[in-house]
Amino acid sequence: MSRAHPKQPVTGRNIPILAITMPALKLLCLHGAGMNSEIMKSHLSSLAKTLEYRNIAQFAYAEGSVETEPGPGITPGLYEGPYYSFHIWPPKAGNLQDEESIQNAYEELLEIIDDEGPFDGLLGFSHGGSFLAELLARYARDNPATDVERLARCAVFINSFPPFRNDPDQNPIIDYELLKHFPKIPTLHVVGTSDFVHEYSTILYEKLHQKAPTSTGLVTHSKGHEIPRDPKVLDKVVAGFEKLNFAVSFSH
């Protein structure tokens, strides 16, 4: 069923115009490694304020349960701990403890969605984006008879890896086979061209664009591994969210 709510037609120069109001997307946000929900809320504050004011999206925040050291760019004292990841990060290939940690995080996030949802979509930054990509792909693979939209009808990735495991030399090995199962839902990708994970964020975008070319959005900026706050970049990101909202509203 469409989320769009048509208002009464109005007329301009004898041409009927249908004014349509789309409700705000309700998104559950997943922070990066060595962060927490309050830090994520702080980093998203400029974007969230604009999106909520314009009734495009509203955010809720999940928090990981694996306590870690502060992540990249997280300065103790400036950002209060404790600091968390959703699972052991980065995960190592063939490591049973890491796989168990991912499985625990998977089950915990499904429980959060069941308890606090429903949500229209999920948003992930860095590690959080990699985890949500794995979550949705695994769920779609393991539950072929269940509509994945009970978890999310869209996804937003900010400077995110695809699902991967590190080899012994600490090189990410992307799980392309798992990524084939990612559902055909609208996605938005925000990618920094100066980011150290730019190559991997681009791969994630390209693979999902192949699955749903008409509903996969891309916003690039010149910054690094951060959630953009520059006003000009924010304008582009907000426009990307508007298109995402439209795609979700008219996806059925």
Swiss-Prot record:
GO cellular component, one term: cytoplasm
Pfam families recorded: FSH1
Pathway(s) annotated for this protein in UniProt: Secondary metabolite biosynthesis
Biotech use, per record: Phomoidrides A and B (also known as CP-225,917 and CP-263,114) are potent inhibitors of Ras farnesyltransferase and squalene synthase. CP-225,917 and CP-263,114 inhibit Ras farnesyl transferase from rat brain with IC(50) values of 6 uM and 20 uoM, respectively. CP-225,917 inhibits squalene synthase with an IC(50) value of 43 uM and CP-263,114 with an IC(50) of 160 uM.
E.C. numbers: 3.1.2.-
Keyword annotations from UniProtKB, A to Z: Hydrolase
Active-site residue numbers: S126 (charge relay system)
GO biological process, one term: secondary metabolic process
Gene Ontology MF terms in the entry: hydrolase activity
Entry's transmembrane regions: none
Record has Transcription regulation as a keyword: no
Function statement: Hydrolase; part of the gene cluster that mediates the biosynthesis of the antihypercholesterolemic agents phomoidrides which are dimeric anhydrides. Within the pathway, phiM releases the C12-fatty acyl chain from phiA. The pathway begins with the highly reducing polyketide synthase tstA that catalyzes the formation of a C12-fatty acyl-ACP, starting from one acetate and 5 malonate units. The hydrolase tstM is involved in the release of the C12-fatty acyl chain from phiA.
Similarity annotation: Belongs to the LovG family.
Protein name: Hydrolase phiM
The species this protein was found in: Talaromyces stipitatus (strain ATCC 10500 / CBS 375.48 / QM 6759 / NRRL 1006) (Penicillium stipitatum)
Lineage: Eukaryota, Fungi, Dikarya, Ascomycota, Pezizomycotina
